[in-house]
Amino acid sequence: MRKIRINKYVIMKKLVLLLFIICCAAGIQANHVVFTADKLGIFPNPERGFTDELGGETKLSDSKNHVVKPEEEWFFDLDDEENEDRKTQRLVVLMYYLYNYKTKDLSNKLLQGFDEDMQILRNHGFKCVLRFAYDWNSKNDAELKWVKRHIEQLKPYWKKNADVIYVMETGFVGRWGEWYYSSHFGNETQELNDSRRQVLQAMIDAVPEDRFLLVRYPLIKLSYLGDENPLTAEEAFSSTPRAKIGHHNDAFLNAWGNDGTYGRNGEGPDD
């Protein structure tokens, strides 16, 4: 009677190979996912689209120094019938006028109020275009030392709430924070003098790393950089001033022209 010799090693190799094939097949099946669209309409994006502006004077007498006043929270409730035409809006411009703080530290009440404003945005899926200024109907801004002090106070709050800040505007200087009519930084000029340069540098240092900073006039950026070299693809989205600084055109679609937005000192407003 013939004896059948069984090669244990060959059998083991075949079993291992079989198990490997089974595991691979099971793995492929387990990772097979079918995606089906549940919504075909436009969905809101918190960094795109049209904006509205909320702003106001932060008063020492306020129980809470909010720009988003309790009576204005309806603005963020997009299920409200009054907001039917704004269902997909997720951007808002917030203007903080520090009228009562031109010669003193920002109060803890104001800083807490800012924090709570940011939480309201967060709760409703909004982001903001953020600007601070000292006056809306005159050129009476604050002295340089107070501007720098206020930026220093606000810096940790900006960092903490970077997730709901879309972009920051330099602000602080002049009427509306627009860097033109000013009591302390040169009046009716776009010139980047030493005081303005210090404010811009303080803002560059204070803005959260992954957020951008907008200046009112392109000339301010050109003067700060000292050249007109274009931004390269390699440098874009980095934290360098050339990549980080943009500009906001407050005269966009203005009936009176661009109000000197793209001019240089000595040129007419629409040259």
Q: In which residue ranges do the predicted regions lie?
A:
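Aromatic-lined substrate-binding rim segments of carbohydrate-active enzymes
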Residues: 70-86, 90-135, 144-147, 207-211
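Sec-dependent N-terminal signal peptides
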Residues: 15-24
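Sec/Tat signal peptide C-region and signal peptidase I cleavage site
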Residues: 26-30
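An active-site-proximal structural segment forming one wall of the substrate-binding cleft
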Residues: 109-126, 142-169, 192-206
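Boundary/entry segment of secreted carbohydrate-active catalytic domains
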Residues: 31-90, 95
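Positively charged n-region of N-terminal signal peptides that target proteins for export
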Residues: 2-3, 8, 12-15
